[in-house]
């Protein structure tokens, strides 16, 4: 049992061990199964890898075989290349041999040709020298022939003068003796031959005696007139001549007007003799500024005729002429007296008063484009047409009777005739579009004026919405009609001067830019036909067909409104060469009388040229060498023309734009181009022009050259115009240098001249001009804080006093030894009071206000004062007192109502217009005074003279 029990225990133990062993075997079998699976996976991976490697090995073997094949081919090609190289070396050696042979042959040929060329050059040089000698001899012969002809003409003229002088000597011996200065008033002669009698009848003798007119060229007219005035001047002031006063002064005015019309050069000797008389007359005119207009006007004419404007300041000169802006020769007076700077103010004043004819005279004389509405003179004529039409309605009424219509037509004809006269006298036809000039001629000839003005009026209305100047005119037109035009002066014909013989008016010709001519005749002439132009539709068809030519474009640009330039743009786009078309349209070179000489001529107006250039600039055309060459040649002649006369600033701007568009700016010096245009135009009219021309970098050098050459004041104007103040600091030092250098030079000339009064006066004048220019520059650029303007004004007064003493012969003492002593004293002198400076301030009356009149008076005063005073307003007879008197003296009251004045009878031909001047006048700013203005209306006066 124990054995069995032990045996069972062993069996149990064996079971447990077996179970454990079985469990361990089961666990091992599971891991073995996993290993078997992994092995199979590894075996399959290795099999695939081996297959891939075998394939790659096969590919490598195939590649190796192909490389071996290619290596064999390469060896074969290397052998072929070696063979080719050997053949090339052989051919190269052969080529070098042939090249050497060719060089030898070429050198031999070149030597041969060189010898032939040298022989030809020697022959050509010899021929040129012979030709040059022959040309010089021909020129010398031509010059001798010309000199001989001139001498023959001079001899013939001298002989004619001698014959004419001998023939007229006996006839005019009494007149010459009366006019001679050395005879004067001491000559014993009959009563009717006295100096007073001569002055009373001087206008008839000078104007109506044709024999005297033939004799004047053989004398010195300036000396004759001076002697005649000087001989009667003292007698005029000593005696109370009563009604003969006006006749004496009128005779002086007649002589001075004729002298100014002759445009003679006054000799220094005559000018020196006229200076004392000018000083004396100027003093009398200042003292009688308000009470004696004829004397004031005569003084202004005398100073202008003899070039004595430097005797006083510009302010005093302005007070002399400001009352006579409606005088026919007022622009010429401004030019002769050196008042060009004040012209813009005068024009603005006339425009405000709607004195369009007087405005037209100034604009044509000085070419003032920028003062026209919108910068276009054509707009001014359109406003003139409108004003003339309204004035005609005021004169003739709004009725439809035949008499009223005839009166309106006569008024329009007279205004148009006067406008054409002013344009022709100033040679300003190119300023205005041809269409408006033709319409003006139509109105003058009375060819259905209303129908003729319809196209112009429509064009004007289209431009009203875009032009500022027209906006102002619209504002003015809102004033009630009766209030604005109640004082129109009916002047239908120009007064005939006593010296002019009444003759039949011959047809005249107005030159228009298109090359055509419009005939003008007297007021009674009625033309049969009116020149017409192709219609706008026909012109457009020609443009669209691509057959635009220069004459067609020229006609189109003259007819085209300046704001509607679509047709012009299309015309330039249709042509294959816009630049060439522009040259043919706008300009040309005309041969002159001299051999090989040319003269530049504009075929269109400056405004039309500017319009075409703007369109051409937008197109940016490609300009070929032939066209550019033509442009260079035209530019050279154009610049010469502008350099001779720079009156048309718009033409200068067109020239500069022309250079930039055609790319020929480099053909001219930058300093020359910058100096063509006034400094004010660079920034105001065309601010981007300098950049367009590429002249920005040249501006500092240009200004520096102006300073080096002594034009310092002008340099300062350019400094401010181009904004170069930061590069030329301080500006005040430049002004001080200018004054210092001018003063030193003048003092040196004064000392060296010793007792030569003419040279001393010239030195003083030079210093006075420098001081006035400096004062103007300081005021313009607001530099008053850096200078004492009062000291500069005192220096000018002291210099003028020294000048008077020198002219009178009393400046040879201490003044001549120390010319600057007067200036040093003036710097410490007490400043003048307001009353003392009144003659050069704003209390001098302005010209009569004729606000609605469209025609200007040809004479600034009346010969018959007594008759004119019958209708004067109350207060006219007040004593003058001091010039700076109360302003009420200039505005006397009256008791006439508007309706009463409108009922006064009007003679459309012989009426004058007078008014009272403006006491609030400012020398620096022209403008109308605030408050009411009073006028004399339609006084019956002698048409030859007008009473103020």
Curated annotation (Swiss-Prot):
List the top taxonomic levels of the source. Answer: Eukaryota, Viridiplantae, Streptophyta, Embryophyta, Tracheophyta
Q: Which spans does this entry mark as compositional bias, Basic and acidic residues?
A: 459-475, 518-527
A Gene Ontology biological process noted in the UniProt record is: cell differentiation
Q: Any idea what this protein is called?
A: FRIGIDA-like protein 5
Biased composition, Low complexity: where in the chain?
A: 807-817
Q: Which Pfam families match?
A: Frigida (PF07899)
> Where do Polar residues bias regions lie?
818-830, 873-894
Which stretches does the entry tag as region Disordered?
A: 447-500, 518-538, 804-894
Residue runs in coiled coils: 47-164
GN (gene name): FRL5
Tissues/organs with expression: Expressed at low levels during seed development.
Task: Give the family this protein belongs to, as stated in its UniProt record.
Answer: Belongs to the Frigida family.
Alphabetic keyword roster: Coiled coil, Developmental protein, Differentiation, Flowering
User: Where in the sequence does UniProt note compositional bias of the Basic residues kind?
Assistant: 861-872
């Amino acid at each position: 049992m124990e054995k069995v029990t032990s045996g069972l225990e062993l069996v149990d133990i064996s079971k447990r061990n077996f179970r454990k062993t079985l469990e361990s075997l089961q666990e091992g079998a599971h891991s073995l199964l996993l290993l078997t699976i992994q092995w199979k996976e590894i075996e399959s991976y290795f099999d695939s890898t081996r297959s891939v490697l075998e394939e790659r090995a096969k590919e490598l073997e195939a590649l190796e075989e192909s490389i071996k094949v290619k290596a064999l081919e390469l060896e074969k090609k290397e052998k072929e290349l070696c063979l080719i190289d050997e053949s090339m070396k052989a051919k190269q050696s052969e080529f070098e041999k042939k090249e050497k042979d060719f060089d030898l042959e070429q050198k031999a040929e070149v030597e041969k040709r060189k010898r032939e060329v040298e022989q030809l050059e020697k022959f050509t040089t010899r021929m040129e020298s012979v030709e040059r000698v022959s040309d010089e001899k021909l020129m010398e012969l031509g010059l001798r022939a010309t000199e001989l002809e001139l001498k023959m003409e001079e001899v013939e003229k001298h002989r004619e003068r001698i014959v004419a002088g001998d023939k007229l000597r006996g006839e005019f011996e009494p007149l010459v003796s009366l006019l001679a200065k050395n005879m004067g008033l001491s000559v014993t002669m009959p009563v009717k031959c006295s100096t007073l009698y001569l002055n009373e009848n001087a206008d008839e003798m000078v104007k109506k005696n044709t024999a005297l007119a033939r004799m004047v060229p053989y004398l010195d007219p300036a000396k004759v007139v001076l002697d005649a005035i000087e001989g009667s001047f003292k007698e005029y002031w000593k005696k109370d001549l009563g009604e003969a006063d006006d006749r004496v002064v009128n005779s002086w005015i007649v002589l001075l007007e004729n002298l100014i019309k002759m445009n003679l050069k006054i000799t220094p000797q005559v000018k020196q003799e006229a200076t004392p008389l000018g000083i004396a007359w100027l003093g009398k005119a200042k003292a009688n500024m308000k009470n004696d207009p004829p004397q004031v006007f005569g003084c202004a004419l005398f100073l202008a005729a003899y070039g004595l404007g430097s005797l006083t300041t510009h302010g005093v000169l302005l007070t002399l002429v400001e009352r006579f802006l409606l005088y026919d020769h007022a622009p010429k007076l401004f030019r002769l007296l050196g008042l060009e700077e004040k012209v813009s103010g005068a024009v603005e004043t006339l425009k405000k008063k709607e004195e369009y004819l007087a405005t037209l005279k100034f604009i044509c004389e000085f070419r003032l484009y920028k003062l026209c509405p919108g910068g276009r003179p054509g707009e001014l004529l359109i406003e003139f047409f409108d004003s003339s039409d309204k004035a005609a309605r005021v004169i003739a009424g709004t009725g439809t009777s035949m008499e009223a219509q005839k009166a309106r037509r006569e008024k329009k004809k007279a205004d148009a005739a006067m406008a054409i006269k002013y344009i022709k006298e100033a040679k300003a036809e190119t300023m205005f579009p041809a269409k408006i000039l033709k319409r003006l001629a139509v109105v003058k000839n009375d060819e259905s004026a209303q129908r003729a003005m319809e196209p112009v009026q429509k064009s004007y209305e289209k431009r009203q919405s875009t032009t500022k100047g027209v906006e102002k005119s619209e504002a003015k037109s809102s004033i009630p009609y009766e209030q604005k035009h109640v004082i129109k002066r009916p002047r239908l014909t120009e007064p005939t001067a006593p010296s002019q013989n009444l003759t039949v008016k011959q047809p005249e010709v107005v030159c228009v830019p298109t090359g055509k001519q419009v005939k003008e005749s007297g007021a009674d002439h009625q033309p049969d036909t009116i020149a017409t132009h192709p219609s706008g539709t026909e012109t457009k068809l020609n443009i669209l067909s691509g057959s635009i030519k220069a004459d067609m474009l020229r006609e189109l640009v003259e007819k085209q409104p300046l704001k509607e330039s679509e047709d012009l743009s299309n015309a330039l786009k249709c042509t294959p060469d816009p630049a060439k078309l522009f040259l043919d349209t706008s300009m040309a070179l005309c041969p002159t009388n001299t051999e090989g000489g040319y003269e530049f001529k504009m075929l269109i107006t400056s405004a039309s040229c500017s319009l075409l250039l703007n369109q051409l600039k937008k197109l940016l055309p490609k300009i070929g060498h032939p066209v550019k060459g033509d442009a260079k040649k035209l530019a050279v002649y154009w610049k010469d023309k502008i350099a001779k006369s720079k009156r048309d600033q718009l033409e200068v701007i067109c020239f500069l734009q022309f250079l930039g568009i055609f790319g020929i700016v480099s053909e001219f010096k930058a300093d020359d181009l910058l100096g063509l245009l006034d400094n004010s135009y660079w920034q105001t009219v065309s601010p981007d022009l300098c950049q367009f021309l590429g002249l920005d970098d040249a501006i500092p050098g240009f200004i520096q050259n102006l300073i080096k050459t002594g034009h310092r004041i002008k340099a300062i104007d350019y400094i401010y115009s181009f904004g170069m103040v930061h590069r030329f600091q301080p500006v005040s030092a430049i002004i001080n240098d200018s004054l210092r250098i001018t003063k030193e030079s003048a003092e040196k000339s004064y000392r060296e001249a010793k007792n030569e009064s003419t040279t001393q006066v010239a030195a003083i004048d030079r210093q006075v001009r420098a001081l006035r220019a400096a004062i103007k520059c300081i005021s313009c650029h607001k530099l008053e804080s850096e200078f004492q303007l009062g000291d500069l004004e005192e220096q000018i007064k002291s210099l003028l006093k020294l000048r008077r003493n020198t002219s009178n012969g009393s400046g040879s003492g201490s003044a001549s030894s120390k010319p600057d002593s007067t200036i040093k004293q003036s710097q410490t002198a007490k400043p003048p009071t307001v009353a003392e400076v009144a003659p050069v301030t704003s209390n001098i009356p302005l010209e009569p206000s004729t606000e609605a009149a469209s025609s200007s008076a040809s004479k600034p005063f009346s010969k018959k004062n007594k008759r004119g005073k019958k209708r004067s307003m109350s207060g006219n007879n007040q004593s003058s007192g001091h010039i700076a008197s109360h302003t009420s003296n200039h505005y006397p009251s009256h008791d006439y109502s508007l309706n009463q004045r409108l009922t006064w009878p009007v003679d459309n031909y012989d009426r004058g217009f007078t008014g009272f001047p403006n006491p609030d006048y400012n020398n620096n700013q022209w403008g109308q005074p605030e408050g009411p203005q009073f006028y004399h209306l339609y006084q019956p006066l002698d048409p030859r003279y007008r009473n103020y």
